[in-house]
């Protein structure tokens, strides 16, 4: 059973308990897979649930992908559209298939510039440039409620950094999860 099949019927949940129902469903899924969230994963995921923008600068292998899964699940449960960005098409493709396994192929799409698969899906894996171009074209009115930016340290690259910077400036209504193992001090971003 994929994670989207576990989505609670939130119409039956009192508004004051919606976030709790979403969180309980997600943590039941992780526990069912034998995964206990690390403190940093839980803190970041709860920040996303609370509507915060989150910077997750933790080492390789510390579970950033699980926080991204939580973010996508939270957005999906709320009827929102989320985008996952990566710097290269091969990583986008890899993440697309991983997200299909977790959320079901009907809920996941991919946009790379070369190809678009299921482009109207609620969860989209895309290159950073795709999201930046959507942000430039549509601004705050873009059909993007949440952006998970992996490898966010690319923001400082002279040639491609714009693709990580533009969404932050133009997608003023979107929630962001910025992830990197090599970002360094993030206090200036907060």
Tell where the protein language model's regions lie, with residue ranges.
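Walker A/P-loop NTP-binding motif
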Residues: 45-54, 63-80, 100, 165-170
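Conserved Walker A/P-loop ATP-binding site and its immediately adjacent core
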Residues: 65-66, 80-101, 130-133, 181-189
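Conserved helix/coil segment N-terminal to the catalytic DExD/H
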Residues: 112-145, 155-156, 161
